[in-house]
Design a protein with these regions (language model features):
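Charged low-complexity stretches with an acidic bias
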Residues: 4, 54-82
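Amphipathic alpha-helical segments that form the core helices of the histone-fold
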Residues: 36-43
Length: 82
C-alpha cells in the first residue's frame, strides 16, 4: 500500500495513462514498456526514493495484471418502462 503523497500522485498519473493507452488500442506489452520507461525515468531523476520506486513498480504491475481495470463497463438495461 502506498502512503507517500508523491508516490501516490505518480501512481494515479501512471494508472490513468495506462487506461488511456488501453482505450486507444495499445495492448499489455505496450503498457509494460510504458511502465518500464516511466519507472526508469523516476529512477534516473531521483524524483522519489528508490524504495518508493520499487513499491510503485509492485503496485503498478499488480494493476496491469488485474484485467478488470481495463474492462469497459456495460450499461445496465433499464427495466420497468414497458
Amino acid at each position: 500500500m502506498l502512503q507517500d503523497t508523491q508516490t501516490i500522485r505518480h501512481y494515479q498519473k501512471l494508472t490513468d495513462a495506462l487506461v488511456e493507452m488501453w482505450n486507444r488500442g495499445y495492448r499489455f506489452d505496450d503498457l509494460r514498456l510504458y511502465l518500464d520507461g516511466y519507472l526508469a525515468a523516476l529512477r534516473h531523476t531521483n524524483a522519489i526514493e528508490p524504495y518508493l520506486v520499487h513499491r510503485l513498480e509492485e503496485e503498478a504491475t499488480r494493476y496491469i495484471h488485474d484485467r478488470s481495470n481495463f474492462e469497459m463497463p456495460l450499461p445496465q438495461p433499464e427495466s420497468g418502462y414497458y
